[in-house]
Amino acid sequence: MPTLLIVDAQSVKNTDTAGSKGYDAGKKISGIKRHIAVDTQGLPHAVAVSTAEVTDRQGALQAMTRCRANLSTIKAVLCDGGYVGQPFELGVKQTLGNAVEVQIAKRNELHKFAVIPKRWVVERSFAWLEKNRRLWKNCERWLNTSLQFVHLAFLALVLRRS
């Protein structure tokens, strides 16, 4: 069982047939967001799909709340700068327990590109999702359908590796 979760969100553009639409003003994308929490091997332990206007913090808490029963061994949650704030930390502690530590991975002050240790694991998981053509853009009418296709993509990945 994992003791560290790495959390991130990905904005995905909608097609014209998509039912749920939102706008992510930060990335200027009209579509949905996928929120995932992965272990150190990149396998998902909490997944949520929301409209794009939902903040990263709210979506991560939604994913952790949905999968709370499977996250009893978590001791730390590693996030990027989009998850800074006392309300998120409090929400994680209420959902996963007071012993859980929220760690924010800080960027370099010079704003140069640098790979932040352990953060690349969640980005690699998003890259694995992008290998599935159906997940390049959101064309589903319901968010739950999109969520199930994310689950199927990770399931297919695990089955290919075993």
Where in the sequence are the language-model features?
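Polybasic low-complexity intrinsically disordered regions
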Residues: 1-98, 103, 107, 153-154
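Basic, amphipathic alpha-helical segments enriched in Lys/Arg and hydrophobic/aromatic residues
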Residues: 90-93, 97-98, 112-162
